[in-house]
Amino acid sequence: MSAKTLYDKLWDSHVVREEEDGTALIYIDRQLLHEVTSPQAFEGLRLANRKPWRIDANLATPDHNVPTTAFNSVEDIVDPISRIQVQTLDANTKQFGITEFGIGDVRQGIVHVVGPEEGVTLPGMTLVCGDSHTATHGALGALAHGVGTSEVEHVLATQCLIQKKMKNMLVKVDGKLQPGVSPKDVVLAIIGQIGTAGGNGHAIEFGGQVFRDMSIEGRMTVCNMAIEAGARVGLVAVDEKTVEYVKGRPFAPKAEDWDAAVAAWQDLKSDDNAHFDKVVEMDGSKIEPQVSWGTSPEMVSDVNGKVPNPAHESDDVKAGGIRRALEYMGLEADMAITDIPVDYVFIGSCTNSRIEDFREAAAVLKGRKVASSVEQALVVPGSGLVKRQAEEEGLDKIFIEAGFEWRNPGCSMCLAMNADRLPSGKHCASTSNRNFEGRQGAGGRTHLVSPQMAAAAAVAGHFVDVRDMMKEAS
């Protein structure tokens, strides 16, 4: 039998039927639902007089439109569209008998945080959600990707999808990361090297010592941004860290089922001689803290670097892109990254709103204050359970004493779909995943960074190398 990649194994184990043209009917083990991309899917079921094929294979939670300030019920949501979408999710899940972690449930939160922490996401599964950052769940060795609303309906009705197999890509990062360099820096550095189209048509497996050493939450950060590298799927092989992370979670297998599951998961890794269509290798020890300066995640630099000069770019198309980005971002060519001012700070999103992210940011902020020039600094937990754990550890007090606002769970300022928005012309140090024009608010200027780098920028009022602050504290 020929050697297989992890992606090959996950794909092959879920093929129901394969056609001569290469398309295949794939079985989907789990679907996660939220309020934005599910209403039309449920309406499609009603119009066709269908019921979900497997009710227990679906889990819903509102996240995109949920206010992060204190409120008592769905009816208190001020924006009428947001309120209707959340109310509609409540009504649809109730009608079709689907489990929902709704407003007021401590388990409510960002769908890509909730799935793994509840054990809903398991190694070896196929998992979809009507959200492009579903690749996050690949950190647990699951074949996970985003789908459109019509496909959400297909999965509800049939538990299957028609797919074409992707190519295999390996991003191998060896060596040891420097202190102060985080998983977010790793994935931004990868995107900076291969570009936002580097993974087009591929499922990316992240391998090498850096990812073996990385925590599961760190792997989630990396897989979360596989889509920003052009790939729908990001994967990390299952190891003992994966098994320990899943063990004991509410939806994880129990007793004999657990033993059988762990035995089945042992092969969820690429075979030694497996073929990858594309291989990228990097030295993790050379990765520096990253800051995006432009309007695409590939427009990124080391914190001690400079904004590029389009005059030095031989490719006219790239030069034009740099000029447009500099104009939108209000930056000058050759400007030092550390000279870029920071008006707002956002620590949160499905990329960086887990407990480890908050511990790292709080370690930077402890005993320090947010600069007076920073107009607003937000910390938004990825779920009610993350919020509760952070408060039990006293992290909320560190953030509040530093001058941050400690909020309730939700997608928040990652995207301009709720009350948390970045004003026009303002620069934001953000731990989210996208920085295109208007992503956080019309005219807003987003700089993608790690939680530590966001915390350091909040204190300084501009971008700084967090490693310098770490040295001061030691």
Curated annotation (Swiss-Prot):
Catalytic reactions of this protein: (2R,3S)-3-isopropylmalate = (2S)-2-isopropylmalate
Iron is among the record's keywords: yes
Cofactor names: [4Fe-4S] cluster
Record lineage: Bacteria, Pseudomonadati, Pseudomonadota, Gammaproteobacteria, Thiotrichales
Organism: Hydrogenovibrio crunogenus (strain DSM 25203 / XCL-2) (Thiomicrospira crunogena)
Cofactor note: Binds 1 [4Fe-4S] cluster per subunit.
Function of the protein: Catalyzes the isomerization between 2-isopropylmalate and 3-isopropylmalate, via the formation of 2-isopropylmaleate.
Top-rank taxon: Bacteria
Pathway involvement of the protein, from the record: Amino-acid biosynthesis; L-leucine biosynthesis; L-leucine from 3-methyl-2-oxobutanoate: step 2/4
Top-tier EC class: lyase
Example GO biological process: L-leucine biosynthetic process
Keyword field contains Lyase: yes
Binding site for [4Fe-4S] cluster: C350, C411, C414
Protein family per UniProt: Belongs to the aconitase/IPM isomerase family. LeuC type 1 subfamily.
Alphabetical list of CDD domains matching this protein: IPMI
Listed name of the protein: 3-isopropylmalate dehydratase large subunit
Pfam family, one: Aconitase
